[in-house]
């Protein structure tokens, strides 16, 4: 996909939550291949931007386009929502499902591929984030770091309903908060590797200076 392809556009976008204006006439465009970092003090609306792109919130005013499509409905109300993938600070794995089932959850739900093909895709995604022989384990059998890697593997699963030209947007919300410097570096490397492997673009919200510097090629204040 050409680098000049616009993946996301916010135009004069504002968000009001009650009497509080969280975002005021934001203008932001993201192009294919970009890795953005959004920085600012607590309460400045960084996570609100992620919620908008994820389809969990609608703007009060202005426009939001993803892959050229106007976003007028919440994600759950769309028949074909945009390819947006979230990686939370908490891995958010389902404790009752194995690693294989957690990573392949979307594909199992869509029922497009056979179990054998889903398994192959899941194993490939796990290997890309450095995980081997864990597919049949449950989340509570893994270390915290391994659980986080599973959440990255899950973000590599492509929506079977999207075409080959679809450009996924990966959202990382405070991915290195509370980690020691060594763990921080590992996750930062994983953010870059995962975004490149998904052939997508990314937005990182973080207060950690090394994460901002290492994972972004453009910083939004």
Predicted regions and their residues:
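Helical segment within the ABC ATPase nucleotide-binding domain
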Residues: 185-197
């Amino acid at each position: 996909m050409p680098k000049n392809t616009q993946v996301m556009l916010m135009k004069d976008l504002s968000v009001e939550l009650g009497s509080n204006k969280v975002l005021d006439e934001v203008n932001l465009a993201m192009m294919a291949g970009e890795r953005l970092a959004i920085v600012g003090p607590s309460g400045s609306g960084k996570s609100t931007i992620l919620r908008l792109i994820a389809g969990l919130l609608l703007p009060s005013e202005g426009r939001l386009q993803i892959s050229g499509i106007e976003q007028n409905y919440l994600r759950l109300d769309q028949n074909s929502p945009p390819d947006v993938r979230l990686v939370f600070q908490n891995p958010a794995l389902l404790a009752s499902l194995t690693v294989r089932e957690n990573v392949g959850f979307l594909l199992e739900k869509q029922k497009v591929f056979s179990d054998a093909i889903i398994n192959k895709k899941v194993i490939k995604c796990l290997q890309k984030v450095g995980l081997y022989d864990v597919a049949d384990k449950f989340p509570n059998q893994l270390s915290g770091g391994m659980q986080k890697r599973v959440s990255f593997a899950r973000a590599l699963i492509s929506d079977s309903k999207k075409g080959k030209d679809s450009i996924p947007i990966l959202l990382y919300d405070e991915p290195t908060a509370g980690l020691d410097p060594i763990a921080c570096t590992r996750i930062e490397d994983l953010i870059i590797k995962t975004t490149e492997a998904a052939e997508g673009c990314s937005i990182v919200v973080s207060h950690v200076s090394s994460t901002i510097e290492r994972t972004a090629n453009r910083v939004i204040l």
